[in-house]
Amino acid sequence: MIALGVNIDHVATLRQARGTRYPDPVEAAFVAERAGADAITAHLREDRRHIVERDVEILSQTLRTRLNLEMAVEEGVLRVAERLSPSDCCLVPERRAELTTEGGLDVAGQLSRIKEACQRLAAAKVRVSLFVDPDPFQLEAAMETGAPVVELHTGRYANTADTATRAEELGQITSAASFADSLGLQVNAGHGLDYHNVQAVAAIPYIRELNIGHAIVAHAVFVGMATAVADMKRLMLEARG
């Protein structure tokens, strides 16, 4: 069985584009849950460009599934997570100029800082995952932090148009997933996955959960949120046979 985490950031982006109260990402989360989402992912960025604390507070109190809060290792957001104690937090790198998260955490390069954040979140009864590139060096460092989960960055696989390069990137993801599993880590994956490329990743047996946002919200513009979520979940389950 493979789980689907639906990222609702882009619903909030649409709301913030006009400074209105709608569309409400909280409502989108409820629709996604009813359509088969196993978790709801939201990124509370330091600059609060889309998801805001109000969203996280309501989601943490009302979701029937799980809230996976994406966040940088930044003091203000860490305090929010400690206070609200969502089911899961995924630590990600963050730069103000980026449109979306552009790569995995350099866990090995900032091991003590990330380890401290993991310990603080664990003390708040939050399960921590680390968003990392499919690199054995980073996976070994992730294990040293005490985080029980890693999320493999699938962006290079998803964004390349070259067939040979895509196959190579998929091989790296598969190898990394196997290695992380051998270390005792739960393996999730995400970034750039859509309705055309998701099945090859969903078929990797070591991967437990995929987090997908932009493709689902974009598809929802034409077919509605419930259908968009159900379509993605169906593709994932088909890939697992």
From Swiss-Prot:
The answer to keyword Metal-binding applying to this record is no
Its assembly, as annotated, is: Homooctamer; tetramer of dimers.
Keywords attached to this Swiss-Prot or TrEMBL record, sorted alphabetically, are: Cytoplasm, Pyridoxine biosynthesis, Transferase
Q: Where does it reside?
A: Cytoplasm
A GO cellular-component term linked to this record: cytosol
**What family does this belong to?**
Belongs to the PNP synthase family.
Binding positions for 3-amino-2-oxopropyl phosphate per the UniProt entry: 7, 18, 192, 213-214
Coiled-coil residues are none
InterPro entries the record matches? Aldolase_TIM (IPR013785), PyrdxlP_synth_PdxJ (IPR004569), Pyridoxine-5'_phos_synth (IPR036130)
Site label Transition state stabilizer, positions: 151
Pfam families, A to Z: PdxJ
Q: Which GO terms describe its molecular function?
A: pyridoxine 5'-phosphate synthase activity
Residues that, per the record, bind 1-deoxy-D-xylulose 5-phosphate: 9-10, 45, 50, 100
List, from the UniProt record, the residues annotated as the active site of this protein: 43, 70, 191
For this protein, the Enzyme Commission number is 2.6.99.2
CDD domains in the record: PNPsynthase
What is the protein name given in its UniProt record? Pyridoxine 5'-phosphate synthase
The UniProt entry, under Gene3D superfamilies, shows: Aldolase class I (3.20.20.70)
**Gene Ontology annotations of biological process type:** pyridoxine biosynthetic process
Under catalytic activity, the entry for this protein gives:
3-amino-2-oxopropyl phosphate + 1-deoxy-D-xylulose 5-phosphate = pyridoxine 5'-phosphate + phosphate + 2 H2O + H(+)
Q: Give the record's pathway.
A: Cofactor biosynthesis; pyridoxine 5'-phosphate biosynthesis; pyridoxine 5'-phosphate from D-erythrose 4-phosphate: step 5/5
Entry function: Catalyzes the complicated ring closure reaction between the two acyclic compounds 1-deoxy-D-xylulose-5-phosphate (DXP) and 3-amino-2-oxopropyl phosphate (1-amino-acetone-3-phosphate or AAP) to form pyridoxine 5'-phosphate (PNP) and inorganic phosphate.
